Amino acid sequence: MEKLAELGINIPSFIAQIVNFGLLLGLLYLFAYKPILAKLDERSTRIKESMERTDQVKEQAQKAEEEFKKKIGEASQQGQLVIERAVKTGDEIRQKAIEEAKAEAEAMLSRARTEIRQERDEVVDQLRKEFAELTILAAGKVIDQSLDKKAHQALIDSVLENSTDLRKN
């Protein structure tokens, strides 16, 4: 101890300083180190929870995006089906309109043919009547006259003139 005194170290003062330093360390440990560690642990826990929440939000966003893509795909398929149905319906309507137009055209042709046949039959009947009348007239004139070639030709010419006059009337 004397050697320590020769060095200028006071032993009671040195022991007091060691005790004081120990007390200071104890107090710092109790009042500073533990609360700081608790705050650091709390902060670490909050960061971990925040990271977990971030991961959950990312997963939810990814699920929502997948759901959105799925719904868009379904909507696209439904839209395609609607378009296909509309095209099919349009084709059916167009085909029905074509068939109706064909049927109407055939009916009109049939009516026109019937009318033409009737008019032709009427004209033929009228010509037969006129021819019969002309034949009767010619026969009557033949009976009234004796026919030589010139008289015969004159008779034919007069009958034809009379027939054209009748047609004009």
From Swiss-Prot:
Q: Which domain of life is it from?
A: Bacteria
CDD domains (UniProt xref): ATP-synt_Fo_b
Keyword Transport listed? The answer is yes
> Where are the bilayer-spanning segments?
11-31
Q: Which PANTHER family match?
A: ATP SYNTHASE SUBUNIT B (PTHR33445:SF1), ATP SYNTHASE SUBUNIT B', CHLOROPLASTIC (PTHR33445)
Q: How does it assemble?
A: F-type ATPases have 2 components, F(1) - the catalytic core - and F(0) - the membrane proton channel. F(1) has five subunits: alpha(3), beta(3), gamma(1), delta(1), epsilon(1). F(0) has three main subunits: a(1), b(2) and c(10-14). The alpha and beta chains form an alternating ring which encloses part of the gamma chain. F(1) is attached to F(0) by a central stalk formed by the gamma and epsilon chains, while a peripheral stalk is formed by the delta and b chains.
Entry similarity comment: Belongs to the ATPase B chain family.
Its name, as the record gives it, is ATP synthase subunit b
| Species name | Dehalococcoides mccartyi (strain ATCC BAA-2100 / JCM 16839 / KCTC 5957 / BAV1)
